[in-house]
Amino acid sequence: MPKRKKVTIVGAGNVGATAAHWIAAEDLADIVLVDIVEGMPQGKALDLKEAAPVYGFDLNIVGTNNYEETADSDVVVITAGVPRKKDPETGKYPSRDELVKTNQQIVGEVTRQVAKYSPEAVLVIVSNPLDAMCHVALHESGFPRERIVGQAGALDTARYMTFIAMELGVSVKDVHGMVLGGHGDQMVPLPHHTSVAGIPVLELMDRETLDAIIERTRKGGGEIVGLLGYSGYYAPAAATVSMVEAIVKDQKRVIPSAAYLEGEYGYNRLFMGVPVVLGAGGIGTG
């Protein structure tokens, strides 16, 4: 019987815990939830484990405050970091880039621990600002670039397709598109490669309407923060789990993700959202 895969999620907050929920519900892999808050990962892991008889999954789910129990993970999802919260003095929300100083220290320490205990793992970075945190993980881990991948385009693409489906009143299953570039204002949706049941989207709506959808997609994270007072987590977790599934099942799915470029697309030494083939070992060539 083949050994079950093992996925560690660092950061047991909203995104991390929701990702753990869906990994368990899909029976993908054993799960280790890690957080610095004592009791929180243990409690969430136990709560999730108690759902097993209802959902029908049969996995080992552990919550911990140390990294020893994460040893030999196949995939490590890093969600740890300071979230986007309203400043009580200014009433403003920080941009992703304003989080870089604090989160680079957090992600750096997490990455060093992960690399120590799971030297063969694929790292899926979710912490913001995404591109900068991917650089931190690459530098601190010493891993080859193929094993560092950022969750960016998968979420942005999901938002883009959702807004198109809402505008046209069609099933999201019939909308196909892709969002590349940076995670945030620098994202680049591809209108001429967007279709609904094979019909180019610009034959179904005018350019002004599509441009409004693109702008809403760029501001999608901020829209959720403005409504909730904190970052969204259902869609980010779902996008993350789609990447984890592709890796642990070696699906070789093409998923837009932040990858470290060394000459591809004319760019060097930076992380950018591009179409990548995700499978066992991380980013491959198909």
Question: Language-model features: where?
Answer:
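N-terminal Rossmann-fold NAD(P) dinucleotide-binding loop
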Residues: 16-17
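Rossmann-like NAD(P)(H) cofactor-binding subdomain of soluble oxidoreductases
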Residues: 91-161
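Conserved S-adenosyl-L-methionine
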Residues: 25-30, 142-144
